[in-house]
Amino acid sequence: MELGLKGKVAMVAASSKGLGFGIAKALAEEGATLSIGSRTKDDIEAAAEQLRKEKNTEVLSSVMDSSNPESILEWTNATIREFGGVDKLVVNAGGPPAGKFEDFSDEDWQAAFELNLFSAVRMIRATLPSMRKRGGGSVLTVTSMAVKEPIDVLILSNVMRSGVTSLIKSLSVQLAADKIRLNNLMPGRIKTCLLYTSPSPRDRG
């Protein structure tokens, strides 16, 4: 399939395994140059090496924490230094812990905000200047089917990912004139390593 991605530079967050890694593989198959980031050095380097061997593509791997603003900027700047700019951004992050409303403190809510909502704001803001300079680009945010039908035990995720969806809807209008396309992916249950650690319907009570 020809999707016009050959030679395009794509940044994919939380991409050492699971859905993020799957997205990176799909982009590589279409000829994109990759900048992948994740928190664990060994995991992200192993993912990069696998992509280079299997997909024969250029890959920059970076240790990156989506909840840390300095880390996001360092990853973006490293990508621009290495490849000259950014064309595609995939905003992805792990989910906050499961639990009921009364289980969570202010600190828990703030941590979920930093990880799942503010990370999207920061990544998009960091890459916008490069996309504008290159005449356009695209952003894909990975949220959850829970933005349509909340999962009762995932209240932190439900709230934050719904916020991301609203952010993308708003920015899709604001950035249309810059030829920057924004879309939101709302996956359901996918057979990745996360599936086996996610709460089942029985666990939700």
Where are these regions (language model features)?
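Active-site loop-to-helix junction immediately N-terminal to the catalytic Tyr of the SDR YXXXK motif
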Residues: 104, 150-158, 170
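Alpha-helical segment proximal to the catalytic Tyr-Lys
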Residues: 129, 173-177
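Conserved small/polar residues in nucleotide/adenosyl-binding loops
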Residues: 196-205
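Residue(s) in the substrate-gating loop at a strand-loop-helix junction
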Residues: 144
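Conserved glycine-rich cofactor-binding loop
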Residues: 14-18
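Substrate-binding pocket helix/loop in short-chain dehydrogenase/reductase
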Residues: 100-101, 108-113, 195
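Active-site helix of classical SDR
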Residues: 124, 160, 168
